[in-house]
Amino acid sequence: MKEKFDLVKLLNILKKNIKLLLILPAICLVVSAALTFFVMPDKYTASTQILVNMKKSSSDLAFQNVQSSLQSVNTYTEIIKSPRILDKVSREFDGQYSTAELNSFLKVTNQTNSQIITVSVTTGNKSESDKIVNKISKVFAHDMPKIMSVDNVTILSSAHDNAVKVSPIVSVNLVISIIVGIVLAILIIFLKELLDKRIKTEEDVESQLGLPILGSIQKF
């Protein structure tokens, strides 16, 4: 019974502060929308896929060759991000992007037990993301045989106007802002209730003052 009473009291507190519960999430929503559409820069990611094959010797078995290639994938990902590759890419762009900038744009990943490397570049310009990731892949494919003993480097897929917008994600930002607004409103409401020591009901007299109720005056 007490739990039911507490729930009713809780709902009454929220109902009494319904304006704050509606206004604060609305304010957060408007602020988030303004930041998302007018402040936060757009980011576009373009990707290519690369396959690196080790050189085969007459004594190598196909399985051993694949295993060797798999074990070397981590090395290849580090080489792609190395100054040896990115310095050359920077020169190809006539210094428009420094090596450090290119490295900040770049992300190199691969799936477990796969020889395929995914090279991704994220910038604020859709076409530039395409150009940079394609250039990095081409420079790597050209220079890799000179760096390590590999048979060939194949660019499986290039970026051709396929960069996708990765941020800001409007729907996610707006939903998060509403949730944050509701949480803040609830916190403010209950904090206000906790700090409010005024006696408003007969129950408050008993709980806060420890005095019995002798009678009450009705409102007319």
From Swiss-Prot:
Pathway involvement of the protein, from the record: Capsule biogenesis; capsule polysaccharide biosynthesis
Coiled coil ranges: none
Keywords, ordered alphabetically: Capsule biogenesis/degradation, Cell membrane, Exopolysaccharide synthesis, Membrane, Transmembrane, Transmembrane helix
Record GO biological process: capsule polysaccharide biosynthetic process
Transmembrane regions: 20-40, 171-191
Molecular function per GO: protein tyrosine kinase activity
Entry's localization field: Cell membrane
Main location: membrane
Bilayer topology: Multi-pass membrane protein
Pfam short name (any one): Wzz
GO CC terms: plasma membrane
Function field: Required for the biosynthesis of type 1 capsular polysaccharide.
Membership in a protein family: Belongs to the CpsC/CapA family.
Protein name: Capsular polysaccharide biosynthesis protein CapA
Organism the protein comes from: Staphylococcus aureus (strain COL)
Annotated gene: capA
